[in-house]
Amino acid sequence: MNGRGFLIYNGGEKMKQKMIIYDTPAGPYPARVRIALAEKNMLSSVQFVRINLWKGEHKKPEFLAKNYSGTVPVLELDDGTLIAECTAITEYIDALDGTPTLTGKTPLEKGVIHMMNKRAELELLDPVSVYFHHATPGLGPEVELYQNKEWGLRQRDKALHGMHYFDTVLRERPYVAGDSFSMADITVIAGLIFAAIVKLQVPEECEALRAWYKRMQQRPSVKKLLEIRSKSS
């Protein structure tokens, strides 16, 4: 649809909902929501407001009033409702058209997707993030007020173990949570994007993971995201 908004379904009745997303275009966590929006053909309908993490804008009172955790992305609806956390935002946008494609349709699909999505966070994406913030310059000394290099390096090793785990998974099936692309795939993609930023290479022996990621990079939603990252970096 044209304009800044989506047609959503409320008891079978179509309603228009305007949305703002606060993020940073090059961010791996915002990448999760941007890929999901592209998969749902909603990317061009959202108003994006850039938050400069390197200047610490996510720690300022005006942003903390929107998200106590001080993280991006954050979704703001036209009634003032604020939704933070990538999984929650993805759940919301996936259900807007009444036909969820990323978070599962059946209880079984939902359970497996959420399990694998959480594993992608715990075993790959979040450890890479900790490595970035603690064992590299991160966002710079004005933002990174406390660093524990030893902890960061341990999390780097955890991320590498996570890559081996997902390689094992992808030797058995085409996608992270089964036979179709889902939110769990998006989270692994974000983890590998972040790994590339911090120059943490996928091990050569993880052939299935490497082949899967090469295939995912050809997916239109991921291609679009990588173009956005390239222009904003």
Curated annotation (Swiss-Prot):
GO MF annotations in UniProt: glutathione binding; glutathione transferase activity
The organism's taxonomic lineage, starting at the top: Eukaryota, Fungi, Dikarya, Ascomycota, Saccharomycotina
Keyword Transferase in annotation: yes
Top-level lineage group: Eukaryota
Protein family according to the UniProt entry: Belongs to the GST superfamily.
Catalytic class of the enzyme: transferase
Entries under CDD domains matching the protein: GST_C_GTT2_like, GST_N_GTT2_like
Name of protein: Glutathione S-transferase 2
Keywords on record: Transferase
GST N-terminal domain segment(s): 17-101
BP term (GO), one: glutathione metabolic process
Documented EC number(s): 2.5.1.18
Any matching Pfam family: GST_N_2
Binding positions for glutathione per the UniProt entry: 29, 58, 72, 85-86, 133
Catalytic activity: RX + glutathione = an S-substituted glutathione + a halide anion + H(+)
Complex formation: Homodimer.
Keyword Transferase annotated: yes
GST C-terminal domain span: 106-233
UniProt cross-references to InterPro entries, sorted A to Z: Glutathione-S-Trfase_C-like, Glutathione-S-Trfase_C_sf, Glutathione_S-Trfase, Glutathione_S-Trfase_N, GST_C, GST_Omega/HSP26, Gtt2-like_C, Gtt2-like_N
GO CC annotation terms, alphabetical: cytoplasm; mitochondrion
